């Protein structure tokens, strides 16, 4: 089983880095091969809204006018069985690194063939060869977990990325909050490891 870890953390140490390590270890303990894509270290340009990917509805990965690392990244994602997606929360959303990546996936991993009611051009995943699975991790410095609904758009964004771009069902989420004041809790570390392990226990479906 191949798990791709999508890491939008700009820092290599700290609470989110610890949770990412725990989730990766959990997946490895379950027998998965884990490949980390550290987005901050890769060349990912802003979407230029040229619509090249939007118009390309036939390719396994939508063509892009930019020559950066995204095509290589998307090929790694296409080969995966499952994903660990992690971002710090910034102004309630995924951070700028995550959102740049999110936008670039919309019609490259996704296709414009989707439709909701009478609305056409809705993203739908190109990765239709098998059902994939995902878990998400978000960290926040100020907002406590019990007030998560007030600021955690990041988890919603990660779940949308999983479903619309990667054809992945999100089977678990973690939001670790109030880290600036109370630090990382042991229960969140355990939860992260459990999330990673849970990916290896999901039933593969064509």
Map each language-model feature to its residues.
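Short helix-loop-beta junction
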Residues: 23-30, 160-168
